Amino acid sequence: VKRVVVLLVAVLAMAAPVVGEAAQTPAIMPLAEVRPGMRGIGKTVVFGQRVDEFRFEVLDILQSGGGPIGSDKLILFRMFGPLAERTGGTAAGMSGSPMYINGRLIGALSAAFAWQAGQRDIALATPIQDMLKVLDRPSRPTSALPTYHASRPHVIGGRVVDRVVVTADPFRALGLLAGLPANTAVATPAVVTFTRGLSPRANRILANLLEPKGHEILQGHGGRGDFAARPLEPGSSVGIQEVRGDVEFGGICTVTTKIGNRVLVCGHPWENLGDVDYALTASEVVTVVRALPRPFKVGNLGQIIGVIDQDRGTAIAGTLGRLPRLFNVRVVVTDQDTGSRTELGAQVVRRRDLARAFTPLIALSAIERARNQAGGEGTAIVKLTLRAKGLPAPIVRENMFYSTQDVATASVLDIVDALELAFYNDLRALEPYDLTVETVLMKRRMTASIVDA
């Protein structure tokens, strides 16, 4: 049984770009001019869509790094002031928060340390000069376990350290910390990822699949809001979304800068897949939860305002006013024993790996919601209808499944084959539009046995 997952994106509305807006690069301060002891302000959203300011002091410039953040130098800084006291320091979702010294942009908050008791005030920033390269060309590949070196020791989380390891996997962070020398700290990207609408079992499968990529999944946090999207500015909260509708998967980051209709966000990669086609959405922040081991933003994602087209090591880049390509998934489940009908609809980013991963989980969630249970004996009659550009007519496939233990999982097996045909077809290039999954469930066993031949 292949365990797979689904990401969603639905087109609600698209904010039009401002007519005649100048594509002007902000005033920047090169990293060579940034010195320890310099102070400045950063911008982020901690409630609604209002951009607030925090204060920071540069502690050091870390050298010779790499890894998930594709820069060989990072800025070590201390966050302070009323906003820092309110949030408990840095929080997941603040990635991309622009940081200025004397009105000049130096970079974006990108990573926080794995464990700081009390106030999480020490963090890392990606230099803006490395981020701007993402608008023009890919970042170079980096090593698996980078180590940045400080010019002098610093106290972080009660430890005196002069080396920092950056890992994309928050699940590994504390384990790495325990096995590293006492003078080495561990930091992870400050991003929050949430899912909504999946069944508990489907969500566990998704978490297991995404754990190697460093996504720490928060189930049930976030959602869609009907709020009006405000014009973006440095410090605005935005959403990155791969699945949208009755099932959702995405995250919240912060805008570092906006140049014409192009935006830079996060200061680190999402999945580091290079050329991509994710949805860029409006976002509002409900609150910042001060939790251990790290605080995180809880927010809502709104209308689609553009597309994320670059997912690189130093930043994520997007274009306002363009729509991502979407693959529609509709699942209808009828329980013949109870007469109940359950329907889920979602839009998935039209990437073959994402559609193949997420679509079966949408179907699994619908079946488990219809039966109000995970697993169990039963028969499923499944009808798949696939539409795609390049096909003379829709492809329809009907099949029957029976299981003594888990009819829900058995019933989604054909979905994988349908997606293989749609996205991995060697004979003809197809552009899949949608897949409809109609499932009829019953407890009655409808099988036969050959008794003689």
Give the residues covered by each predicted segment.
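Bacterial N-terminal signal peptides
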Residues: 5-16
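Terminal presequence/propeptide segments associated with secretion/organelle targeting
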Residues: 17-453
